[in-house]
Amino acid sequence: MTTLLAYALAALAEIAGCFAIWAWLRLGRSPLWLGPGLASLILFAVLLTRVESAAAGRAYAAYGGVYVAASLLWLWAAEGQRPDRWDLGGAALCLAGSAVVLLGPRG
């Protein structure tokens, strides 16, 4: 599995898991949402172990930008709220930072 695919799938799993808990606590949904939510969060953690990185902290840091961008896609697709220019600019900055962490020369 490529690093980018692992990050994308991890973001989807993390956001889905966190949203399940949000739905239970904030939207008054059934506690039955917690089962799939916790399973998604476990899948998220497993997927992050599949990225090509010698250090966990670097893998997590690079993932952060992907998470921000994916969260804004979730905002639009699942919650029906279109990200504004500030959201998009912030996501672009985060993705640029992730690229530096992920692709920067090591020595």
Swiss-Prot record:
<keyword id="KW-0812">Transmembrane</keyword>
<feature type="transmembrane region" description="Helical">
    <location>
        <begin position="85"/>
        <end position="105"/>
    </location>
</feature>
<dbReference type="GO" id="GO:0005886">
    <property type="term" value="C:plasma membrane"/>
</dbReference>
<feature type="transmembrane region" description="Helical">
    <location>
        <begin position="4"/>
        <end position="24"/>
    </location>
</feature>
<keyword id="KW-0997">Cell inner membrane</keyword>
<protein>
    <recommendedName>
        <fullName>UPF0060 membrane protein M446_5886</fullName>
    </recommendedName>
</protein>
<comment type="similarity">
    <text>Belongs to the UPF0060 family.</text>
</comment>
<keyword id="KW-1133">Transmembrane helix</keyword>
<feature type="transmembrane region" description="Helical">
    <location>
        <begin position="31"/>
        <end position="51"/>
    </location>
</feature>
<keyword id="KW-0472">Membrane</keyword>
<feature type="transmembrane region" description="Helical">
    <location>
        <begin position="59"/>
        <end position="79"/>
    </location>
</feature>
<dbReference type="InterPro" id="IPR003844">
    <property type="entry name" value="UPF0060"/>
</dbReference>
<dbReference type="Pfam" id="PF02694">
    <property type="entry name" value="UPF0060"/>
</dbReference>
<keyword id="KW-1003">Cell membrane</keyword>
